């Protein structure tokens, strides 16, 4: 790999399809500056294939690209553009495996209930792939996310639709506030490097090692907390009754993708709580049939056909309890898909902002919007959303044409906090104590547990905390905007961080800067007050709030989080550039297959590519890469001003048309820039050709719409078929080829 190499990740679903169209343009333009753009396959299918080489024929095997990029991210040369990928739930994982098996890959099935060592090994490999398995590996730095000026200005000039709020809205957040992860949390700072052992000690003294070795560094913050399941069930029963009494929709909002151990278990308890009679009567039958509430109501209902004699009876019981209970929030009212069907369908960081943007409503079973009780069982961050809801109830909806912005500096590096806890999270088998023990036998932290409780330990290393504080000061200095650390002195982990933040802030010149430390609830209120005045406020947060807020505020400001600039300055000098904060849009793929129209908006890719070129220019001295960055910035501004994003309706341009217009504006900017005469000459002919052939090219791109498209697979499309579908304009393809 040369020092002028950019890695452009091949991922999943809509962004992967967009890559077939946009990557040839990127590679052609980059080649004029001596920049090599390579791909690495970190798609769900690719990660599955790479994990089972011994099961596959030689020609089917592929390298572990994620592991390779994880190592690259630790080097100064790293320049990685990361597109959104699938964080697979178990149903998605099984679907991907089935598709690959159908394509001739002799992969083992996912063992739901492994019986042998071989099955346990297979299960362990698959479990490493599921959930948010990609981002923690690549994120060897903290996060700097913000709306670029061009995007913010466009949103102000063309405000997206916001649902009206009334003071009578009955929408609220429900959260436990006791016996949950936040309220039970204990925290310690490690004095010297070593290892910890996580063990369970039963009432009779029997000790079971849950995790033999957890490496820790000096200065690291380690936490232990427990979610008590008896309290969870009592809480859920009360909220189901409350939703019924208040005549609002019942909904639960979790993060079963990233929190892939704890949240599917919590989701399963919600399903059980909503259908108490059915599980009391048929629970053992469902277990025997391998149907778990953790996988969602949809998986259970689909599996009832395989339950002899009483499958229909069980289905009727579920339907009766749906009729008796509060109305369920729906994912798809037309298809009868409820909030409880699939654990990964309602993801809190996307679902809560969407609800707030839509008058505090979700969709009900009758196909109409309605006020909603949003259940966020753990209280760590639930209060943030309640403050926003209360603010809208008093002041009405936000106005995108005037509101301020909340850029984020997020503590993320080296699997910080909850998002690195998967391998230290356990569903407890028996009552007792779980403790973290150091190499000398001293108990560092311990928690009393009952059977079924969920124990979780988290780690946050000191070097990332120092880097996070530095990044916060840097951004505050660069923008002149107040920076607020969202830390709660009443929470054990946050109290440790507050002490460190105060220590490390003292090392910087903060004269003239406004830097506050407020609890998440206080920080939300402070930021909202400024937003309504049109003022910006930097949120400096931990890993989870980084994730939540970089959806919440962009969705309110811009209508989407996919238009955010997401830069990860890697701690060893490289750069990771994430294309927006949105997901991978499965419904976009369904529409493409149905009618050959892809409404994916690649603005996030355009923004990330520009800062990637800029980083390359800075680190390697490649002046032409800087010209590419500057001209791409200006081209993106023209792209927005001319409104060339996908039209979202048949007969208008889609993702492919947006790539043409970006290529046109970029070529025009390159042709007229004066920093590099040779580059200007190289793009003169292309700019002329694309301009003259605009009508022909757009016609060719639109002509294919309206008929089904065959891409040869969902999780692993056929490359030739997908390329043919995504590059249907021979005129455009030939023009781009002239640069090679």
Where are these regions (language model features)?
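Short, solvent-exposed positions on alpha-helices
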Residues: 626, 677-681
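A glycine-biased, small/acidic residue-tolerant capping/turn segment at secondary-structure junctions
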Residues: 698-714
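Short, charged, amphipathic alpha-helical segments
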Residues: 680-688
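Ligand-binding pocket scaffold of soluble enzyme catalytic domains
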Residues: 671-674
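Extended, well-ordered protein cores
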Residues: 2-268, 277-500, 504, 508-666, ...
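C-terminal accessory extensions/subdomains outside the catalytic/core fold
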Residues: 717-740
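Intrinsically disordered, low-complexity regulatory segments in eukaryotic proteins
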Residues: 680, 697-698
């Amino acid at each position: 790999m040369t020092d002028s190499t950019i890695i452009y990740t091949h991922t999943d679903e809509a962004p992967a399809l967009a890559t077939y169209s946009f990557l040839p343009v990127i590679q052609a333009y980059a080649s004029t500056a001596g920049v090599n753009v390579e791909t690495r396959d970190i798609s769900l299918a690719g990660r599955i294939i790479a994990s089972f080489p011994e099961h596959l024929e030689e020609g089917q095997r592929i390298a572990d690209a994620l592991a390779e990029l994880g190592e690259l991210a630790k080097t100064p040369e790293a320049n990685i553009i990361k597109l959104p990928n699938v964080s697979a739930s178990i149903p998605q994982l099984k679907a991907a495996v089935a598709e690959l098996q159908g394509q001739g890959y002799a992969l083992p099935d996912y063992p739901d209930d492994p019986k042998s060592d071989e099955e346990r090994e297979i299960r362990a490999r698959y479990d490493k792939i599921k959930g948010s398995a990609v981002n923690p590996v690549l994120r060897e730095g903290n996060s700097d996310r913000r709306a670029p000026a061009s995007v913010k200005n466009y949103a102000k000039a063309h405000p997206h639709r916001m649902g009206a709020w009334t003071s009578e809205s009955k929408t609220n957040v429900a959260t436990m506030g006791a016996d949950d992860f936040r309220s039970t949390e204990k925290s310690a700072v490690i004095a010297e490097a070593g290892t910890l052992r996580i063990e369970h000690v039963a009432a009779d003294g029997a000790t079971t090692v849950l995790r033999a070795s957890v490496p820790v560094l000096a200065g690291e913050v380690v936490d232990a907390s427990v979610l008590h399941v008896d309290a969870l069930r009592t809480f859920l029963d009360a909220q189901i009754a409350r939703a019924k009494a208040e005549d609002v929709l019942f909904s639960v909002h979790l993060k079963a993708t990233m929190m892939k151990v704890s949240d599917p278990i919590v989701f399963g308890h919600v399903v059980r709580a909503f259908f108490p009679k059915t599980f009391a009567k048929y629970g053992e039958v469902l277990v025997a049939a391998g149907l778990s509430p953790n996988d969602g109501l949809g998986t259970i209902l689909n599996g009832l056909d395989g339950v002899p004699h009483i499958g229909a009876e069980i289905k009727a019981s579920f339907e009766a309890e749906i009729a008796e209970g509060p109305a369920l929030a729906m994912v798809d009212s037309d298809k009868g898909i409820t909030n409880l069907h699939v654990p990964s369908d309602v993801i809190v960081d996307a679902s809560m902002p969407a609800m707030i943007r839509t008058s505090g409503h979700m969709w009900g079973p009758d196909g109409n919007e309605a006020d909603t009780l949003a259940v966020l069982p753990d209280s760590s961050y639930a209060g943030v959303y309640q403050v926003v809801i209360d603010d809208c109830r008093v002041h009405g909806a936000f106005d995108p044409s005037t509101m301020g912005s909340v850029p984020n500096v997020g503590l993320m590096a080296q699997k910080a906090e909850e998002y690195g806890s998967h391998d230290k999270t356990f569903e407890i088998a028996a009552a007792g104590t779980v403790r973290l023990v150091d190499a000398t036998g001293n108990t560092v932290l311990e928690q009393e547990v009952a059977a079924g409780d969920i124990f979780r330990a988290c780690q946050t290393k000191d070097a990332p905390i120092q880097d996070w504080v530095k990044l916060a000061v840097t951004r505050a200095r660069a923008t002149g905007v107040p920076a607020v650390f969202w830390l709660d002195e009443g929470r054990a982990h946050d109290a440790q961080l507050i002490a460190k933040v105060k220590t490390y802030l003292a090392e910087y010149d903060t004269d003239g800067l406004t830097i506050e430390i407020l609890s998440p609830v206080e920080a939300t209120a402070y930021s909202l007050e400024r937003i309504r005045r049109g003022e910006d406020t930097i949120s400096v947060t931990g890993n989870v709030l980084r994730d939540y807020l970089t959806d919440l505020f962009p969705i309110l400001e811009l209508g989407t989080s996919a238009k955010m600039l997401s830069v990860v300055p890697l701690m060893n000098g490289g750069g990771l550039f994430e294309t927006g904060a949105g997901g991978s849009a499965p419904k976009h793929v369904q529409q493409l297959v149905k009618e050959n129209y892809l409404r994916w908006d690649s603005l996030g890719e355009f923004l990330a590519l520009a800062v990637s070129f800029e980083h390359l220019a800075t680190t390697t001295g490649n002046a032409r890469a800087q010209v590419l960055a500057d001209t791409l910035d200006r081209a993106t501004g023209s792209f927005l001003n001319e409104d060339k994003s996908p039209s979202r309706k048949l007969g208008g341009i889609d993702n492919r048309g947006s790539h043409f217009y970006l290529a046109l504006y970029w070529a025009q900017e390159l042709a007229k820039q004066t920093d590099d005469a040779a580059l200007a000459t190289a793009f003169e002919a292309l700019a002329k050709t694309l301009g003259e052939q605009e009508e022909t090219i757009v016609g060719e791109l639109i002509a294919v719409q309206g008929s089904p498209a065959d891409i040869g697979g969902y999780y692993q499309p056929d490359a030739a078929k997908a390329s043919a579908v995504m590059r249907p304009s021979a005129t455009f393809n030939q023009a781009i080829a002239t640069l090679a």
